[in-house]
């Protein structure tokens, strides 16, 4: 087990100051960071004064003239929340227009942008098409739609080569907007705030919870002051007004506690939306999206719950929440099947001899929509980079030159998801893959991206990545904020760190601490709930408890001795509240045995 201090500990700093400094927050900025206000929300016109005026004018024209309007819902959590903000906001102002002249389109799969819905658009008389969270670079489709006399408004945050000449584009990446860590939901919310400004209203404030969830869903950086304020304010209990978010918080109240935090949303709300997008039917996706709409969520619909009576009804949002849980369970079962398949390949093909685990799958073996999730799990379990690739046949562009008369010639590629393993020190896995010169493409983030490799290059790719990663350590490297010695760790420090729970999220990693040379004896070691959920507990005289979930009788007995066993422990700080009492805990992530004695003096 390897661990390393993020920065040398400055004894003059409080735990809060040390941890914020370790995450790139300057001492002079810390008070502001912890106490953001509405003054930290940027002026929406910074998205482009002329563009935002044009977008508002196009929307107002559509409303005033009852023009048929389409909202294209992008296929992820940010896309769903972006579109929900816009439709809810417009319903507040123009309920008749939304009811009679506005439609939305849900993708059947994980396709982004306009490519799969052009036929639908062209078969309908939509004059205005609004696309939140997507399509900034769909230039050819913009041109086609404009030539057909349709107006397109893009409300996006994705990078693109240039601003489209055939659409009205609001995009923080393509403008002078200072905050590049604002998601599509944030851009839509800012557009609604601009509409409030020109008409003298405050309706956009009602949807900051959706903006918060969208930013969490797209993993926007919490180092951004504006983004942090949107998320912090949006998740305050008094601002949770969206039926879906409120319902998910209630369903997951045991895990979330009495409030939604960024990391809580990322673990207990966002995955239910993303699993629906990946694994839900179109009907299931629609009911989830409707549960985010105030004019739909509380409608009474026929119940489909087990054991319902004929004709029994329930609120749409209640059915949506239950459906989201069921789809997530269904996806988990598919993940488990996929895990079993690829783990069998690891053993059969002796794959652990290589630095990158490359799975070459046949079509249909694993649903492409969950391949990335399985890659994540394999990466974490086997502690090395993963490529989860499926074979596909691609028409050779030079077919007509290869034979007379020409016959179709296909090249075999393997395409899919790549995941790097940052805990081993790899921060640039995408670059490593590209530097082989053998990939057709590698696009996305450094440690989570899509990749394509021609079949004939696979063996050479394995050879080159083995060489590039020859120094890769298979065991994880934990970056910790503090290294404590045995019983020197204090309850106050653990609780101070635990109380930072509200700030953990993207680029504000949850704090890890190391406790070295901790002596475990039969007097301070307990196995709780051994028959149901075995949980290891080590209790110090100062009342700090070390907790390891998912333990076993076997693990307990290995640590049990008449003397003592000495451990180094990596863990997360937690404040456990029970019956009004708060006690400090360290939740064990990993540990190693470094010594033992038959005697305990």
What is the role of each PLM region?
Residues 68-127:
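Anionic-ligand anchoring segments at beta-strand to alpha-helix junctions in alpha/beta enzyme folds, i.e.
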Residues 16, 21-25, 63-67, 75, ...:
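A structured phosphate/pyrophosphate-recognition subdomain
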Residues 376, 541-561:
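Beta-strand/loop nucleic-acid-binding surfaces
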Residues 20, 74-76, 128-130, 156, ...:
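Divalent metal-coordination and catalytic microenvironments
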Residues 143, 222, 243, 278-283, ...:
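Glycine-rich, acidic loop segments that terminate in or are immediately followed by a histidine
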Residues 484-544:
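Accessory interdomain/linker segments of ATP-dependent helicases and helicase-like nucleic-acid enzymes
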Residues 1-72, 92:
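An N-terminal, well-structured beta->alpha segment
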Residues 449, 457-462, 556, 565-601:
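OB-fold single-stranded nucleic acid-binding module
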């Amino acid at each position: 087990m390897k661990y390393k201090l993020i920065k040398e500990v400055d004894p003059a700093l409080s735990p809060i100051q040390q941890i914020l400094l370790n995450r790139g927050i300057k001492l002079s900025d810390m008070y502001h960071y912890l106490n953001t206000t509405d003054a930290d929300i940027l002026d929406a016109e910074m998205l482009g004064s002329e563009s935002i005026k044009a977008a508002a004018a196009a929307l107002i024209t559509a409303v005033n003239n009852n023009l048929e309007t389409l909202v294209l819902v992008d296929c992820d959590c940010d896309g769903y929340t972006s579109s929900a903000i816009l439709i809810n906001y417009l319903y507040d102002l123009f309920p008749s227009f939304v009811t009679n002249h506005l439609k939305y389109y849900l993708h059947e799969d994980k396709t982004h942008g306009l490519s799969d819905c052009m036929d639908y658009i062209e078969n309908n008389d939509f004059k205005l098409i609004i696309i939140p969270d997507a399509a900034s670079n769909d230039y050819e489709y913009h041109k086609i739609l404009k030539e057909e006399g349709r107006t397109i408004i893009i409300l996006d945050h994705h990078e693109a080569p240039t601003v489209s000449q055939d659409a009205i584009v609001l995009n923080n990446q393509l403008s002078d907007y200072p905050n590049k860590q604002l998601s599509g939901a944030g851009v839509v919310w800012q557009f609604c705030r601009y509409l409030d400004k020109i008409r003298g209203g405050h309706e956009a404030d009602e949807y900051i919870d959706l903006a918060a969830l969208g930013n969490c869903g797209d993993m926007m950086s919490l180092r951004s002051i504006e983004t942090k304020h949107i998320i912090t304010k949006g998740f305050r209990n008094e601002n949770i007004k969206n039926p879906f978010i409120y319902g998910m918080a209630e369903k997951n109240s045991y895990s979330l506690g009495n409030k939604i935090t960024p990391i809580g949303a990322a673990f207990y709300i966002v995955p239910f939306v993303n699993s629906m997008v990946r694994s839900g039917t179109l009907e299931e996706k629609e009911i989830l999206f409707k549960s985010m709409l105030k004019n739909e969520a509380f409608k009474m619909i026929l119940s489909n719950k087990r054991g319902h009576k004929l004709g029994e009804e329930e609120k749409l949002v209640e059915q949506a929440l239950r459906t989201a849980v069921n789809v997530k369970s269904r996806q988990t079962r598919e993940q488990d099947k996929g895990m079993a398949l690829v783990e069998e390949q690891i053993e059969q093909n002796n794959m652990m001899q290589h630095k990158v685990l490359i799975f070459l799958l046949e079509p249909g073996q694993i649903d492409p929509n969950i391949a990335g999730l399985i890659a994540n799990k394999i990466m974490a379990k086997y502690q090395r980079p993963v490529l989860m690739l499926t074979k596909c046949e691609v028409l050779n562009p030079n077919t007509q030159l290869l034979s007379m008369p020409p016959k179709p010639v296909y090249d075999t590629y393997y395409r899919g998801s790549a995941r790097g393993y940052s805990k081993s020190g790899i921060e640039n896995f995408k670059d490593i893959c590209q530097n082989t010169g053998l990939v057709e493409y590698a696009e996305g983030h450094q440690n989570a991206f899509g990749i394509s490799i021609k079949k004939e290059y696979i063996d050479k790719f394995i050879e080159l990545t083995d060489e590039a990663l020859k120094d890769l350590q298979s065991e994880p490297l934990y970056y910790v904020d503090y290294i404590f010695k045995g019983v020197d760790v204090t309850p106050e420090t653990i609780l101070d760190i635990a109380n930072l729970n509200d700030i953990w999220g993207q680029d504000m990693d949850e704090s890890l601490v190391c406790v070295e040379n901790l002596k475990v004896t039969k007097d301070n070691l307990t196995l709780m709930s051994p028959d149901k959920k075995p949980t290891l507990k080590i209790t110090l005289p100062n009342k700090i408890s070390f907790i390891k979930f998912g333990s076993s009788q076997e693990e307990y007995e290995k640590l049990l001795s008449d003397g003592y066993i000495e451990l180094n422990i990596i863990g997360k700080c937690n404040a456990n509240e029970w019956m009004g009492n708060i006690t400090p805990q360290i939740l064990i992530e990993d540990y190693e045995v470094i010594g033992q004695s038959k005697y305990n003096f």
